[in-house]
Amino acid sequence: MTILIDADGCPVVDLTLQIAKQFGVPVIILCDTSHQLEREGAQTLVFDKGADSVDFALVSRVKPGDIVVTQDYGLASMCLAKCARVLNQNGLEYTADNIDALMLRRYESKKLLRTGKHPKGSPKRTKEQDVRFADTLEKILNYNH
């Protein structure tokens, strides 16, 4: 089992590394050239900027039983199809039961943008979100260890 982080814009890279270290689980950080994130205790793979270049690199590496951290619903869906456990930076675990509704919500938001309406942005990150993320990741790791 490996934890793969879609690190472009990911606020929980360091928290993930801290938890992974406690469980002895290797971490791979994947990012593009505008977000190079070298961290001790993790392998960092850097890819050219481009539409979904990091996403496709991550999908090509993920294996059944791996854990993926991403906020990208499309990437999450592809990783679920490869039997990975997938969670976002707020501790929401993506599953076969919720991914379709999340993808539909993303589609509806993009439709609104095309009409000139802008959905409300995300509020500032809170400590509670970090706690939820840590709890979810630890539960997954405890289950798989």
Place the predicted regions along the sequence by residue.
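Nuclease catalytic cores that cleave nucleic-acid phosphodiester bonds
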Residues: 2-145
